[in-house]
Design a protein with these regions (language model features):
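Short, low-complexity N-terminal intrinsically disordered segments enriched in polar/charged residues
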Residues: 2-4, 8-60, 80
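A solvent-exposed, acidic/Ser-Thr-rich amphipathic alpha-helical stretch
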Residues: 29-37, 51-107, 131-132
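Hydrophobic/aromatic beta-strand elements that line small-molecule binding cavities or substrate pockets
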Residues: 85-86, 100-105, 118-120, 135-141, ...
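A short, structured loop/turn motif at beta-sheet edges
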Residues: 105-112, 125-128, 140-146
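Generic C-terminal helix-cap and adjacent flexible tail
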Residues: 28-29, 157-159
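Short beta-strand edge/turn micro-motifs at domain boundaries
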Residues: 113, 133-158
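Sequence/structural signature of outer-membrane beta-barrel proteins
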Residues: 121-123, 158-159
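Short, well-ordered beta-strand segments in beta-rich or mixed alpha/beta enzyme
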Residues: 65-68, 111-122
Length: 159
């Protein structure tokens, strides 16, 4: 192979790589930061026990799901289940303090997922204090310029 052909192949390869990096599916730093902000908004609403703020975090779609660390069933659908889950949880737990650590954020520009851990300090109505170490996966969907939660799955780490 002569030098001219090698240069043409190299130029084609670099052009392809540059275009692939700018494709719609490539992760954009602005999307990553926006997903992290949406993720933190969820935890702010949770720790504040604020149903109105929680409503603003979720997509109002029939396919959203919520599995809390103490859930016995899967809440499917925003209007039918998820919107009702949070007021009940806030009523059952007069104290909620949750901190989140992000391990990974991934997005294709339309869907994003955040994997990490939570430490939940809870107090029940009866006064019982609970501390849960949790593995969490949160999935977000982009609607317009907002990232809205479509799935929250929190799994207690066995002791």
């Amino acid at each position: 192979m002569n030098r001219r052909n090698m240069l043409a192949i190299t130029a084609t390869l670099f052009t392809g790589l540059a275009l692939a990096g700018k494709s719609a599916g490539a992760q954009q730093p602005a999307d990553i930061e926006a997903v992290k902000a949406a993720h933190q908004s969820f935890y702010k609403a949770l720790s504040a026990r604020n149903a109105k703020a929680m409503e603003a975090v979720w997509a109002n779609k029939a396919y959203v799901i919520n599995i809390g660390p103490r859930s016995k069933t899967i809440a499917v659908g925003y209007a039918d289940a998820v919107s009702q889950y949070w007021p009940k949880a806030f009523d059952a737990l007069p104290k909620i303090a949750v901190t989140s650590t992000i391990t990974q954020v991934q997005t294709d520009g339309k869907i994003a997922w955040v994997v990490g851990t939570e430490i939940a300090n809870l107090q029940t109505k009866s006064g019982e204090s609970l501390k849960l170490d949790i593995i969490v996966t949160n999935i977000f969907e982009k609607e317009g310029d907002r990232w809205l939660m479509v799935s929250h799955h929190a799994l207690p780490i066995p002791k």
